[in-house]
């Protein structure tokens, strides 16, 4: 819900939401407002399988977002160049540009979803459980990629996750919510080392320790 409010898909019923100094408490009512917000804030969904149009080639996925949010009017050749530039940024070489989503693995699809978001050159990317559907080894690759992109492009992330190990790896600051209320917040490393709220302590205690193995039944 918080993510949907930030991108303008939900109206705030109490309190305020501010993005880059601008009040975003009201849902975007007009197409122009939605485009302005989308240029500022892009969204990467949890499911890399349903978030892409299965009939649209990867190059077209990226180019459509480039075309929608470009401040100039790039021609076909320039759009192709920019699309490949964005795909290069997420580690997908030229051979992927003509492929369909069904030809890609889950990790590759999520790279495409990240590239689609970056095509708008946003200030903020909302990642809603963006690695939860991926294998652990692929999760690590995507998290490392996101860290590199953040450093290179100076983009901020709102990373929504229930996995504290993932949160610890990707975030600088952490907010803990319980039943829609903020119950804890602060520097991620400090908060995980010394949680103050009972709910945060319970979350931390639920994380398996090193060498953990499931019990046999």
Where are these regions (language model features)?
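Conserved catalytic motifs of ABC-family nucleotide-binding domains
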Residues: 121
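A short, surface-exposed alpha-helical micro-motif characterized by mixed small hydrophobic
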Residues: 167-169
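ABC ATPase "signature
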Residues: 182-186
């Amino acid at each position: 819900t918080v993510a949907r409010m930030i991108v303008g898909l939900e109206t705030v019923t109490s309190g305020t939401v501010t993005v880059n100094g601008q009040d975003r408490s009201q849902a975007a009512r007009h197409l122009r407002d939605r485009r302005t917000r989308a240029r500022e804030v892009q969204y990467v969904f949890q499911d890399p399988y349903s978030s892409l149009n299965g009939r649209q080639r990867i190059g077209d996925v990226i180019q459509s977002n480039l075309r929608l949010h470009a401040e100039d009017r790039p021609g076909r050749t320039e759009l192709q160049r920019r699309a490949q530039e964005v795909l290069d940024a997420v580690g997908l070489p030229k051979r992927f540009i003509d492929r369909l989503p069904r030809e890609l693995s889950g990790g590759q699809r999520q790279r495409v979803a990240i590239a689609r978001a970056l095509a708008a050159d946003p200030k903020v990317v909302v990642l809603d459980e963006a690695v939860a559907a991926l294998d652990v080894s692929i999760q690590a690759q995507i998290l490392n990629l996101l860290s590199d992109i953040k450093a290179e492009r100076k983009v901020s992330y709102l990373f929504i996750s229930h996995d504290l190990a993932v949160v610890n790896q990707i975030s600088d600051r952490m907010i803990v919510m319980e039943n829609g209320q903020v119950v804890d917040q602060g520097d991620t490393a400090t908060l995980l080392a010394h949680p103050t709220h009972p709910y945060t302590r319970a979350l931390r205690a639920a994380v398996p320790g090193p060498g953990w193995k499931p019990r046999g039944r």
